[in-house]
């Protein structure tokens, strides 16, 4: 039986921390779907199609990883793919408090829904999309924070 998971996020933009979690998930699961949330309510810096493209470029060459956009409930997206496991990255205790609430809410919507929490490596633990956006707004260098495949897209 194939073990599959979904790694959802806004990825505004995708960071080395996200990519780190994806690479860790690939070691555990046979198939990983990176699900890019439309998330209009978050007022993303980058458009939906741009974010999907950035994630696609970032995971090129990773076996058994695919990228899809979604604009519905995560649980509904998961059911449509017959996958009941989601991966979430944790950097700090504050992340866990938020993610635990989301995990419980998803489980309330679908009792078979499981959330697996993975930590990025220490060198990527401080990286967040918010930090990257802040550095970009101030014309700073984000080359150490994001996958090299998307660096040119961020500066464009």
From Swiss-Prot:
Pathway: Cofactor biosynthesis; coenzyme A biosynthesis; CoA from (R)-pantothenate: step 4/5
Gene Ontology molecular functions: ATP binding; pantetheine-phosphate adenylyltransferase activity
Marked site (Transition state stabilizer) residue numbers: 18
Signal peptide (UniProt feature, chain positions): none
Catalytic activity: (R)-4'-phosphopantetheine + ATP + H(+) = 3'-dephospho-CoA + diphosphate
Protein task: Reversibly transfers an adenylyl group from ATP to 4'-phosphopantetheine, yielding dephospho-CoA (dPCoA) and pyrophosphate.
PANTHER family: PHOSPHOPANTETHEINE ADENYLYLTRANSFERASE
Cofactors required: Mg(2+)
Residues reported to bind ATP: 10-11, 18, 89-91, 99, 124-130
Homology family: Belongs to the bacterial CoaD family.
InterPro entries documented for this protein: Cyt_trans-like, PPAT, Rossmann-like_a/b/a_fold
Quaternary structure note: Homohexamer.
One GO CC annotation: cytoplasm
The UniProt record lists the keyword Nucleotide-binding: yes
Protein name: Phosphopantetheine adenylyltransferase
UniProt key word Magnesium: yes
Keyword set, alphabetical order: ATP-binding, Coenzyme A biosynthesis, Cytoplasm, Magnesium, Nucleotide-binding, Nucleotidyltransferase, Transferase
SUPFAM superfamilies associated with the record: Nucleotidylyl transferase
Highest rank taxon of the organism: Bacteria
Annotated S-S bridges: none
GO biological process: coenzyme A biosynthetic process
């Amino acid at each position: 039986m194939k073990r599959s998971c979904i790694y959802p996020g806004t990825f505004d933009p995708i960071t080395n921390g996200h990519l780190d979690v994806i690479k860790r998930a690939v070691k555990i699961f046979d198939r990983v779907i990176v699900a890019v949330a439309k998330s209009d309510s978050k007022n993303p810096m980058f458009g939906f199609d741009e974010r999907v493209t950035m994630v696609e470029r970032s995971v090129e060459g990773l076996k058994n990883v695919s990228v899809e956009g979604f604009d519905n409930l995560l649980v509904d997206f998961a059911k449509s793919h017959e996958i009941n496991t989601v991966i979430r990255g944790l950097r700090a205790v504050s992340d866990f408090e938020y993610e635990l609430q989301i995990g419980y809410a998803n489980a309330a919507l679908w009792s078979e829904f499981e959330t697996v929490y993975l930590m990025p490596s220490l060198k990527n633990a401080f990286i967040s999309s918010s930090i990257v956006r802040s550095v970009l707004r101030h014309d700073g260098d984000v080359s150490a924070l994001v996958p090299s495949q998307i660096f040119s897209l961020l500066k464009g």
